[in-house]
């Protein structure tokens, strides 16, 4: 995985070049990105001086063997400039953002592209403000130009109020189609203009589009389509993924975040698109986001193997290159580890549970959020897999994990691998004519529970344990199950018992484990998902659901992240301890027996179909294991 390091132009004004070269060497950089805010309100240096710095350091860095590129802001760089701002559905102008349908904006931005290209730069990175959602408020854009487009699309004049009412109706409809078409047109037309402007100067100029979360459905287009518009005849565009170490600063655990860029990288690999990971600890320094989190991110993507490059933001955007040295020093310390991970995991395929979560679910969902980008950013499914330390693989074949609106997108044929459903997904599949073992339901909403006391609990029959359930009141269903369904756990809520979870095989041979609650509602609540019994139940039932055992699972360690990959002869396992607690003598249950074992970052042995580590995995440390037949 090649390393690219972003450097802000203003830090180059008075930099010590020896310090810069040292940090780049420590980070393992092959490419340096010169970050320029383009002409906008937050431009670090004025335009003429910026051009001078870019030329000077482009030559200097190339002279020291580095590749170079310029990074430019896009829709977020023209605040208070007189261009049409993005406008929310409530009519609020977002003055820090320009609307891509403004022809004047398009011309101005393309002029920036031409000027950068004229400096002899061969690659331009477009900031992840190339988007229309996830800006400052409610969904966009509802400026006059977009409203005119919606009216023409629908064949009659419409108001913002009518669009709002239609958009948040319970099902996809003409208003949602019009809104997504308007977003798509604005961004795709601008991408075409940018490519045409680049070709005027250099047909071999390439682009890297930094994805924002809204590009995955919320903006009506997708990264691959935009990438195609930005690609030249001899210059295929690349993508920088979204989902970074700094998301953990905003209450998104990194062990839950990491499967988002992993999934994007998998899709890029299938499509033959070169991609970069977003190894960003913004806002630096390590007081905010630790080097450990950056290394967690780096090593997971390296082991996964689908990400070609990594943006490693190891230098501060304001201070000197000697102010924050920790990110670079930690990367230098781990250089040998990177080589060991690559050797151990390279050439193998990820195995485990299959999270079924299509990127275009905003288009199909019956519940559109006011911030639709959240439908892909922080999902119940990723919180679930990280809470239970489940190995995940994005290629079909493992037990499917299907929650909520995702059930509208599942192909019936894929259910042959088995599926875990929440009740929302089960109801959707039943509406689609798929038998999930429910004869009849009566919705029941218990009253208030008091002051967070565990007056809910769940009894697991096979695990022989009762688990307290905390949190808000929950709506559940009083289920009458069909013959053949087996109750696996029982919910006791205030004064009544309900089915907690059950297994069922229908006449088509499709096997299910179904929870009697909505995962979106309860995934962050103690006991409902973050539970040793929930984890043990899954491990026990995987062979029944899928027809083959899970290749590797490690029970009983909160916030352990596990990744598994195998080939015909061996299995590689990565264990990342994202918990504040150490893990003493962890045991990894394997799907079969192996003959030999190799461990990096610990010691241990094979015992039948288990790996028993005899050393600890301390908080925020990792261990890598390879077993062979």
Describe the residue ranges of each PLM region.
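Hydrophobic targeting/anchoring helices
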Residues: 35, 122, 127, 133-134, ...
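Active-site-adjacent "subsite" loops/lids of carbohydrate-active enzymes
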Residues: 67-121, 128, 132-136, 144-147, ...
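Aromatic-lined carbohydrate-recognition surfaces of secreted/lumenal glycan-active proteins
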Residues: 1-12, 67-74, 125-129, 174-222, ...
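A conserved amphipathic helix/loop scaffold
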Residues: 373-377, 394, 401-625
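Short, acidic/polar
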Residues: 10-26, 103-116, 221-229, 290-301
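Aromatic-lined substrate-binding rim segments of carbohydrate-active enzymes
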Residues: 20-21, 37-88, 190-198
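Catalytic domains of carbohydrate-active enzymes, especially glycoside hydrolases
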Residues: 15-40, 115-123, 235-239, 297-309, ...
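The substrate-binding groove and active-site-proximal loops of carbohydrate-active enzymes
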Residues: 3-12, 38-51, 91-110, 171-188, ...
């Amino acid at each position: 995985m090649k390393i690219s390091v972003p450097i802000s132009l203003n830090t180059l004004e008075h930099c010590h070049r020896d310090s810069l070269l040292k940090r780049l060497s420590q980070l393992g950089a092959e490419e340096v990105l010169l970050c320029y805010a383009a002409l906008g309100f937050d431009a670090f240096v004025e335009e003429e001086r910026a051009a001078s710095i870019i030329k000077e350091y482009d030559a200097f860095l190339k002279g020291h063997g580095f590749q170079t590129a310029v990074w430019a802001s896009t829709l977020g760089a023209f605040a208070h400039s007189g261009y049409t701002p993005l406008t929310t559905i409530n009519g609020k102008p977002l003055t820090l953002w320009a609307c891509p349908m403004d022809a004047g904006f398009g011309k101005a931005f393309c002029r920036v592209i031409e000027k950068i290209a004229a400096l002899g730069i061969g690659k331009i990175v477009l900031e992840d403000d190339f988007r229309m959602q996830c800006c400052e408020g409610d969904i966009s854009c509802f400026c006059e130009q977009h409203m005119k487009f919606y009216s023409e699309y629908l064949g009659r004049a419409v108001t913002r109020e009518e669009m709002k009412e239609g958009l948040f109706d319970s099902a996809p409809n003409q208003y949602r189609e019009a809104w997504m078409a308007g977003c798509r047109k604005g961004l795709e037309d601008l991408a075409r203009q940018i490519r045409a402007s680049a070709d005027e100067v250099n047909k071999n100029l390439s682009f890297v589009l930094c994805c924002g979360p809204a590009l995955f459905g919320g903006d009506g287009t997708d990264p691959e389509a935009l990438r195609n518009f930005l690609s030249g005849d001899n210059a295929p565009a690349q993508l920088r993924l979204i989902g970074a170490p700094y998301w953990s600063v905003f209450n998104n655990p990194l062990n839950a975040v990491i499967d988002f860029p992993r999934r994007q990288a998998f899709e890029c690999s299938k499509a033959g698109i070169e991609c970069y990971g977003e190894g960003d600890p913004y806002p630096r320094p390590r007081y905010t986001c630790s080097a450990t989190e950056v290394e967690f991110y780096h090593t997971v993507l390296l082991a996964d193997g689908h990400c070609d490059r990594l943006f490693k933001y190891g230098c501060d955007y304001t201070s000197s290159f000697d102010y924050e040295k920790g990110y670079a020093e930690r990367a230098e310390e781990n250089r040998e580890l990177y080589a060991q991970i690559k050797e151990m995991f390279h050439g193998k395929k990820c195995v485990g549970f299959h999270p079924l979560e299509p990127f275009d679910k905003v288009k199909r969902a019956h519940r559109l959020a006011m911030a639709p980008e959240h439908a892909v950013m922080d999902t119940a499914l990723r919180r679930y897999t990280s809470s239970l330390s489940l190995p995940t693989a994005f290629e079909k074949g493992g037990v499917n994990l299907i929650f909520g609106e995702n059930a509208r997108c599942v192909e019936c044929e894929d259910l042959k691998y088995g599926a875990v459903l929440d009740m929302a997904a089960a109801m959707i599949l039943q509406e689609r004519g798929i038998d999930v073992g429910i004869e009849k339901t009566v919705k029941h909403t218990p009253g208030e529970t008091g002051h967070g006391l565990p007056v809910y609990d769940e009894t697991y029959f096979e695990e022989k344990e009762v688990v307290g359930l905390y949190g808000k009141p929950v709506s559940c269903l009083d289920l009458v199950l069909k013959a053949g369904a087996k109750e696996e756990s029982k919910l006791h809520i205030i004064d009544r018992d309900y089915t907690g979870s059950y297994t069922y095989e229908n006449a088509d041979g499709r096997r299910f484990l179904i929870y009697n609650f909505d995962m979106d509602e309860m995934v962050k609540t103690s006991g409902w998902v973050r539970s040793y019994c929930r984890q043990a139940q899954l491990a026990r039932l995987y062979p029944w659901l899928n027809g083959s055992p899970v290749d590797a699972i490690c029970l009983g360690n909160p916030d352990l992240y596990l990744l598994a990959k195998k080939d015909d002869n061996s299995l590689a396992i990565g264990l990342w301890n994202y918990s504040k607690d150490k893990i003493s003598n962890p045991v990894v249950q394997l799907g079969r027996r192996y003959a030999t074992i190799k461990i990096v970052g610990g010691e241990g042995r094979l015992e039948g179909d288990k790996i028993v580590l005899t050393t600890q995995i301390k908080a925020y440390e990792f261990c890598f294991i390879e077993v062979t037949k």
